[in-house]
Each structure stands twice: as C-alpha cells, then as structure tokens.
C-alpha cells in the first residue's frame, strides 16, 4: 500500500468506529464497508495518481490494517496484527504514541527485549466482540523489575512519563507538573534522572535496538504472535494460490504474491524494489510486466 502508516491505521479505526456504533444502537441489522480494494478512477476523483485508496486491501489484494480489523471479527482463524513497526524513526520526535492491535485473541502479552511488561485485553470499542486494543505504555513493570523502584514510586513516575508522551514536556497539564515536583522532592530525583528514564524506557534514543513481541492468548494458551525489531536480514517470499491451472471453455488464473520480508516475516515497507516478470510456455502474465514492491 502506498499510504502512510498513519492513514492506514486511521482507516482501520474508522471502520471499527462505524461497526461499533452500528452494533450498539440496536437499530441496524448489518453494516457493509466500502470497499474491498483500491481502484483506478477518473481525473476528477481520487488521488493524484487517479487511484482511490478506499480499499481495505490495495490494488494487488494485499491487506491493510482495516482488512486485519475485519478479519479479527470472526472466531475460526487466529488473527493478530500490530498497526506499527515500532521503529521510532517513523514517528515525529521518536514518540510512538498510541499503537493499535487488531486481534481476536482473548488477551495479548507484550514483551520488550524478551521481558514481559504487560498484558492487554480491554478495548474502547465495547460493542465489538473483538475491538481494537490500544497500546501506549511501553514502560509496563520495568521500573520495578529493572530499576528496583517500589510499586508506588514506579506507578507515579510511569504515569508522568506516559503523560509526557501524550502531551509533550512543554505542554504537560498542571497536575502532572505537580506530580513531577512531588517526585523530585519525595524521591530526590533530578530532571536529568527523569530524562534518563524517558530515553531508556520510552523513546529508546541512544540505546540498543528494541525487540517487541505481541503474543496472542486464546483459551489460556499461546497462539499466533507478532515480533517487531530492527531488521537486518531480508528475504524474498513468493506465494501462489494454486500450482495447477485447468484449461476449459475459458481460461484459469492464479494469484502470485511477491514479498520482501524481514527475519520476523514482517513486510519490509521501505524495500520498494523493481520486479520484472517474464513468462514462457503456454501461460501469460495478466498483470504488469514491471512493477515495484
């Protein structure tokens, strides 16, 4: 998909909002989304490339965040998808803010560098069986386990650091400024100490690349998971719907997907490499002969 991650995430949340509202007012028998895929359009509509990016999948039938949201509303197959790469360079000021998890898991255990920091399950989309789950607390229990802080001290510091993520240090509401003052007096901490904790547990600046694991839990058992880290090894993956085509009164087709994935089998979104496709024998390419991933 060509849209930014912000737009793909926002699109998925708008789908969730509409379906949630339709279910909770008891006046709708169903809801139909627009639409399945991005599509070509005329010059007076769509984006500058004359493509309408309304689809929950792109023009090549590759799923966006919204497709994973809809997929999470069923019970047959396990679904877990994180709306972020967790790379701080994708965010203004390196602050991730709120990340969303689209899943039909009962809960999600979150690990940072192989250490469990929290378990998530609640969603603001209360009318949905499996509403999107927000995640913004990248600190979890680490102030207790890593810094050795008592729980009361850890909780108030964590609350203040997370508030700095939401509002920025320059725009902190008065109540958080008062809490920071209390922390500095009560625990004899300096502003420099706060900056160190913020950089270590929130922004990640100057530290070793982080690895995040989102482990889905179904019926008290681990199922599918998503692991996100700084990629260093890419590989090519080719998938096809079928290996056999049948000749009949018409013609048969199969869909072939070409992906560049990282070592955790996540898409490499910046690997926009050219691909040339050639066929031989009694088959023909029905798509583009030259395209970018």
Q: What are the residue ranges of the model-derived segments?
A:
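Low-complexity "stalk/linker" and mucin-like segments enriched in Ser/Thr/Pro/Ala/Gly
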Residues: 125-139, 239, 281-293
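Extracellular Ig-like/FN3 beta-sandwich strand-entry sites
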Residues: 207-211, 251-253, 272
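Extended substrate-binding grooves/exosites of carbohydrate-active enzymes
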Residues: 1-195
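Beta-strand-rich structural segments
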Residues: 99-103, 252-269
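Short, well-ordered beta-strand segments
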Residues: 54, 115-119, 271-284, 288-290
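Short, aromatic- and glycine-rich surface loops/edge beta-strands on solvent-exposed regions
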Residues: 144-159, 203-221, 293
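Edge beta-strands of extracellular beta-sandwich domains
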Residues: 119, 220-237
């Amino acid at each position: 998909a060509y849209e930014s991650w912000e737009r793909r995430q926002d699109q998925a949340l708008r789908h969730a909002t509409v379906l949630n509202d339709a279910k909770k007012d008891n006046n709708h028998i169903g809801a139909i989304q627009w639409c399945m895929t991005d599509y070509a359009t005329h010059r007076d509509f769509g984006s500058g490339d004359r493509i309408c990016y309304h689809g929950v999948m792109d023009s090549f039938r590759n799923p966006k965040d919204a497709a994973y949201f809809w997929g999470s509303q069923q019970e047959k197959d396990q679904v877990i998808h994180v709306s972020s790469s967790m790379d701080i360079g994708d965010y203004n000021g390196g602050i991730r803010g709120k990340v969303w998890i689209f899943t039909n898991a009962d809960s999600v255990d979150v690990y940072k560098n192989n250490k469990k920091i929290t378990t998530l399950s609640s969603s603001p989309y209360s009318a949905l069986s499996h509403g999107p789950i927000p995640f913004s607390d990248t600190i979890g229990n680490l102030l207790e386990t890593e810094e050795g802080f008592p729980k009361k001290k850890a909780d108030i510091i964590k609350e203040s650091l997370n508030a700095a993520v939401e509002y920025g240090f320059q725009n902190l509401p008065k109540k958080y400024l008062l809490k920071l003052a209390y922390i500095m007096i009560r625990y004899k901490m300096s502003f420099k100490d706060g900056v160190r904790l913020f950089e270590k547990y929130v922004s990640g600046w100057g530290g070793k690349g982080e690895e995040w694991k989102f482990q889905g839990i179904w019926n008290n058992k681990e199922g599918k998971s998503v692991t996100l880290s700084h990629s260093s090894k890419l590989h090519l993956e080719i998938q096809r719907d079928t290996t056999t085509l049948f000749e009949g009164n018409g013609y048969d087709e199969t869909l072939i997907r070409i992906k560049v994935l990282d070592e955790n089998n996540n898409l490499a979104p910046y690997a926009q490499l050219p691909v040339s496709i050639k066929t031989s024998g009694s088959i023909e390419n029905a798509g583009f002969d030259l395209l970018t991933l």
